[in-house]
């Protein structure tokens, strides 16, 4: 039995500017961990861009990152000639599609400021542009101290 009335719900929110990463899949778990308050609840990690995305996946074997990038480039090739939205380059429309496939946010339970990820799980920034630049991430924690 959980007495929900004894808890005082709080919201914590912070924007993080990630450095520019090359195209590919990059672990950003530590960037998130370093900003977590000592709260218990749920964290939402949201990226404020349409050409990069976030996902949670295996963090141990670096070849996973290479396989992800390779597979997404096969699934959504830049050489496809049916894209109309190409003003910003051949990687523009494909980056929007890849971002839509993976999503712009992840939710993770936290306990006392610790991410409750599985042993082999990490948070990835999926950079779909050749020159994506710095990326803005918003973390929002809904929970209690």
Which residues fall in each region the model found?
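Active-site histidine-anchored catalytic micro-motif
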Residues: 5-145
């Amino acid at each position: 039995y959980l007495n929900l009335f004894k808890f005082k719900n709080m919201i914590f929110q912070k924007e993080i500017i990630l450095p520019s990463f090359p195209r590919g899949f990059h672990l950003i778990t530590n960037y998130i961990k370093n900003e977590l308050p000592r709260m218990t609840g749920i964290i939402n990690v949201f990226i404020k861009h349409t050409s990069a995305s976030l996902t949670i996946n295996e963090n141990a074997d670096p070849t996973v990152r290479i396989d992800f990038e390779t597979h997404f480039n096969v699934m959504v090739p830049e050489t496809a000639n049916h894209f109309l939205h190409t003003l910003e380059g051949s990687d523009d429309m494909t980056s929007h599609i890849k971002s839509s496939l993976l999503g712009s946010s992840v939710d993770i339970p936290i306990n006392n400021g610790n991410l409750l990820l599985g042993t082999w799980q990490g948070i990835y920034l999926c950079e779909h542009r050749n020159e994506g630049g710095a990326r803005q991430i918003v973390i929002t924690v809904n929970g209690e101290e």
